[in-house]
């Protein structure tokens, strides 16, 4: 924070290009570009874009949007958070990012995630009788950081939308590679080529592109382990799975082996933040976040983000589905909430925080990031 940190921990932005109720994908994309320009001015290190399909966000074609953002900015790093390797081949990913890197060299972060492949595991878990499932960890507070009881994602992952999405994005009969193998294929294409049988394939463009590879994960499972074993930086998703953030970073560090890319573990932790000039305003702006998460968790996917001035409050039953996410949001004025972000960084040992903020109006999203940049001490011009 600006009041005590001589060298502030770097902050980055994770943007979903959310579509607000009554708005359009085109406006959401323009808003993301505007936010990226502002983030660069305010001293944020990176601007990352999520990949989601067939829902009310504008970032489905992540590499395309990354190129648009890179063209609209000068120096901020731009990347994916994360490419869903279950829906893309390693070759297509490297060629896409290599193409953008050819025009904007040295500015791209290639974040890789397991979506698509992980769905099969969750479906298997959903089919397991409740009595045979491991009991959930109880809620706890570790050195000031809230770790709520884990959400049972297996209960909703079998929704028709998720199944239809997989069917639309994957070829019939295609066998998805193991996530670790897919990551290694990406690295091979970037480093000099991938041998398939007796043929060595070279990604053009893509080979030797100046792209930094990241792995995203929410638990102590394969993503954290692969990131560590391959010597890659790791992003732990506190904003999506707050209950498991510590086990994720611990597993990553335990499996870490130095590589040509990274000599020591590097951890980024995500946080969902809504800052405003006072606590009551911030609470009002964040009041429809629970509605948005509820749609996602009950299988409808992200719907247009509701206007807090007209939306009805969540019912008690709806609130129970999203309670962990609401209570682990960082909502308020900078003076009352920034210390909680400091706690998140300290307890997880994060080298960097990545901030996501979803509000109905772009102006409120911009103001949230601006206030945080000023409070954190990223730049004197943030206030």
List each language-model region with its residue ranges.
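Hydrophobic faces of well-ordered beta-strands that scaffold small-molecule active sites
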Residues: 11-15, 47-49, 77-81, 108-112, ...
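An alpha-helical appendage that flanks or caps ligand/catalytic pockets
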Residues: 2-7, 130-204, 243-348, 380-383
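A conserved active-site cap/scaffold subdomain adjacent to cofactor or substrate pockets
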Residues: 222-243
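Conserved, mostly hydrophobic/aromatic
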Residues: 11, 39, 43, 51, ...
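N-terminal beta1-alpha1-beta2 module of alpha/beta enzyme domains
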Residues: 1-78
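A generic, well-ordered mixed alpha/beta core segment in the N-terminal half of proteins
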Residues: 89-137
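Short, acidic/polar
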Residues: 26-38, 218-225, 334-343
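Active-site mouth loops of central-metabolism enzymes
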Residues: 15-30, 60, 82-91, 207-219, ...
């Amino acid at each position: 924070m600006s009041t005590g940190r001589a060298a502030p921990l770097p902050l980055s932005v994770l943007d979903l290009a959310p579509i607000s109720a009554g708005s359009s994908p085109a406006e959401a994309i323009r808003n993301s570009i505007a936010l990226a320009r502002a983030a660069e001015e305010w001293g944020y290190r990176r601007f990352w874009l999520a990949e989601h399909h067939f829902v009310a966000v504008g970032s489905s074609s992540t590499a395309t949007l990354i190129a648009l953002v890179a063209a609209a900015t000068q120096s901020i790093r731009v990347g994916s958070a994360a490419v869903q390797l279950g829906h893309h081949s390693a070759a297509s990913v490297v060629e896409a990012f290599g193409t953008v890197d050819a025009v904007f060299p040295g500015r791209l972060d290639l974040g890789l995630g397991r979506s698509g492949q992980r769905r099969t595991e969750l479906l298997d878990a959903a089919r397991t009788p409740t009595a045979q499932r491991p009991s959930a960890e109880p809620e706890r507070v570790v050195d000031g950081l809230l770790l709520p009881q884990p959400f049972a994602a297996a209960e909703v992952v079998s929704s028709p939308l998720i199944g239809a999405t997989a069917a639309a994005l994957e070829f019939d009969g295609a066998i998805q590679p193991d996530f670790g193998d897919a990551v290694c294929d990406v690295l091979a294409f970037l480093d000099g080529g991938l041998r398939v049988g007796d043929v060595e394939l070279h990604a053009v463009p893509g080979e030797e592109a100046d792209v930094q590879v990241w792995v995203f994960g929410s638990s102590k499972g394969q993503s954290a382990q692969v990131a560590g074993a391959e010597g890659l930086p790791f992003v732990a998703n506190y904003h999506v799975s707050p209950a498991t953030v510590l086990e994720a970073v611990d597993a990553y560090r335990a499996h870490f082996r130095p590589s040509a890319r990274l000599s020591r573990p590097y951890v980024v932790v995500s946080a969902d933040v809504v800052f405003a000039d006072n606590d009551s305003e911030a609470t009002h702006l964040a009041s429809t976040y629970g509605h948005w998460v509820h749609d996602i968790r009950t299988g409808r996917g992200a719907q247009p983000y509701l206007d807090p001035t007209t939306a009805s409050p969540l019912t008690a039953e709806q609130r129970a589905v999203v309670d962990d996410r609401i209570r682990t949001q960082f909502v308020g004025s900078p003076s009352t909430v920034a210390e909680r972000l400091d706690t998140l960084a300290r307890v997880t040992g994060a080298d960097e925080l990545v901030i996501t903020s979803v509000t109905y109006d772009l102006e409120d999203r911009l103001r949230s990031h601006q206030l945080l940049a000023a409070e954190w001490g990223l730049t004197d011009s943030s206030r």
